[in-house]
Amino acid sequence: MQQLFSQHIARIQQIVQHALELARLDGLWIYAGQAKYHFLDDQTSPFKINPHFNYIFPDPTVEQSWLFLDGKNKPKLYFYAPQDYWHCTPNPPTSAFFADEFEWQMLTDSQQIQQYIINPTHCAFIGEQTELAKSLGFEHINPQKVLNVLHFERSIKSEFEIECIYQAQLTALAGHHAAKEAFFASKSEFEINLAYLQATKQSDNNVPYGNIVAINQHSAILHYTKLDFTPPCERHSFLLDAGTSYLGYASDLTRTYAFEPQSEFAAMIAQMEQFKLDTIADMQVGMNYLSYHTQMHRWISQMLHQFEFVKLPADQIFEEGISRTFFPHGLGHQLGLQVHDVAGFQQNHRGTRKAPPEIYPSLRCTRDLAEGMVLTIEPGFYFIEMLLNQWKNHPLAPFFNWQKIDEFKRYGGIRTEDNIVMRATGAENLTAKAESISSR
């Protein structure tokens, strides 16, 4: 990891130098951020680090620390380690594999940073705390020219970042295995979530996103995070969308299970799994992500015809937009320090944005695929009453097999999701690679 991180930092230095030249600035100050207090309270939300800080310093727990970069000299880290008997104080990771890439300065008081910030009017500040930046004399606060370069470059992962995301696959798969066992052992959603957290050695405060632990019809709620405490009387299906993080880099995996392995719903899950793998096998550098999303809608249309949910030819199902009712989200998204990572729509360093087509408003990526991109591939098929109701008074309503659709609402839906990295030769499935190791 040390060699990969050295290469990662060398690349960041070039990126920062380019961004500063474009913005005609001398340096970049990045603030890690700080926990936010609840309204009229002395309790805080869990700390979430500034991703631009974590991009450079691979420890997502360091609060109120600073980084200074000029693209030429060794990055300077101002590590905040106060003396405090009320709270756990951070232990500076000065012996970690990444430590030698930084020039260290300890801060025991957050106000001490003022003495190190020289010529703030000639530097950029990157962070959420804009009032703090103003009080320290910064004028170029989150300048768009700088952010455009950083965001676009963050969409192409270094080998260090790819390794971190791969490591996060391994831990997430352990959690998925434990959660699957808990479901088939008749546990509640709450208990399944506990099994996942225990297996991944995480708490609800540091998962990369809220775990989606959905039994039966709850799978039809795309971001279901409620967690029932009581096991259901009957079990039909289970959808788990949950990940882990490694040094701040996320994994994002989804699996769906049928309680009855010989059921028609189980056959649908197998079909969706094959659609996902076929998509990954087809992906090539230079192709636009939208083309794979559109192809998935054609396959979903075939599935609607094949399983007799809609009694129309597959081509007509696609052309009429019926597949969008059963697959209402995008095929996937960029993945990295943020689960929905940056620059999914950004086409270049200048920040040119390409919006998704009107018919696919939930698509999160309109980019041409490039080597080093890490993305999720997550097709879905759902029975969502709110969306289905829009067709009940439509001229095509008689072609919907409403009786069968109503019967399948108890399953909620299907989603299957792997994480891939684009290579020169095509997509490498990081999830499948980790599964092959985990199953040995």
Swiss-Prot record:
One of the protein's GO biological processes: proteolysis
Keywords on record: Dipeptidase, Hydrolase, Manganese, Metal-binding, Metalloprotease, Protease
Task of the protein: Splits dipeptides with a prolyl residue in the C-terminal position.
Keyword Chloroplast: no
Source organism of this protein record: Glaesserella parasuis serovar 5 (strain SH0165)
Gene: pepQ
Molecular function GO labels: aminopeptidase activity; metal ion binding; metalloexopeptidase activity; phosphoric triester hydrolase activity; proline dipeptidase activity
Sequence similarity: Belongs to the peptidase M24B family. Bacterial-type prolidase subfamily.
Reaction(s) the record says it catalyses: Xaa-L-Pro dipeptide + H2O = an L-alpha-amino acid + L-proline
Protein name: Xaa-Pro dipeptidase
Statement: the UniProt record of this protein carries the keyword Ribosomal protein: no
Binding residues annotated for Mn(2+) 2, in chain numbering: 241, 252, 417
HAMAP family per UniProt: X_Pro_dipeptid (MF_01279)
Domain of life: Bacteria
Cofactor note: Binds 2 manganese ions per subunit.
